[in-house]
C-alpha cells in the first residue's frame, strides 16, 4: 500500500515537472557567486537543521546542494559557518577547475549569507570564547577573505535563494525563488511524426 502510494506520488511529481528546465542566460562576465542558507532546527520531530547552497557562474546556476543534518546543532552560528566553509571549498574548487581549463574568472567570488554575525566573523580575526568551537572554519574563511580570494556579503532573508530547498514556502514565494533559479517552463511544439501519443 505504501509503495503504491509512493509510486503514484512520484509519477504525479514527474508529470508536473515535464516541461521545466534551466534557462541559461547569455553570460556578460564570468564571475562566481555563492548563496548559503540554513533552516536551523526546523524539524520539530528531531530538531535537525536543513542546509543548502547554490553556486552561479555569470548569473547561471551551475551547482547546488541541500542536506538535512545528521546531528542537532546547538548554535545556528556554528552551523552557518560550517556551511559557509563548505560553500567556500566548492567555490575554490570550481575556481581551480576553471583555471586548469584556462577560463578566466573575473574578480573575487562573492559568497552571500543572511547572517550579519557570520558575515562579521568572516572578515574579523578577533575571537571570543563563544566562537572557539568554530575556530578552524573561521580561520579558513578569514584567510580567504584577507587574501582577497573570497568576499563574504550580507543578503536579506527575502533575497536568499536557497530558501527554496531549505524551508517550507508559500506558492507565491516558491514561484519568486524559482524564477531566481532560472527554472523555466518550456513549451514544446511537436510537428508531424514528432508528436507524443
For the regions a language model picked out, list residue spans one by one.
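C-terminal reverse transcriptase regions that engage the nucleic-acid substrate
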Residues: 1-21, 156, 166-168
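Conserved hydrophobic/aromatic pocket- or pore-lining residues that grip, position, or stack substrates
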Residues: 10, 37, 55
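Structured nucleic-acid-interacting core domains from mobile-element enzymes and related host factors
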Residues: 12-36
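Conserved helix-loop functional segments at active or binding sites
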Residues: 16-20, 41, 61-63, 97-100
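RNase H-like nuclease module associated with reverse transcription
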Residues: 31, 49, 61, 67-197
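Short acidic, Gly/Ser-rich segments with clustered Asp/Glu that frequently serve as metal-coordination loops
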Residues: 38-46, 116-119
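Acidic, metal-ligating active-site segments
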Residues: 43-59
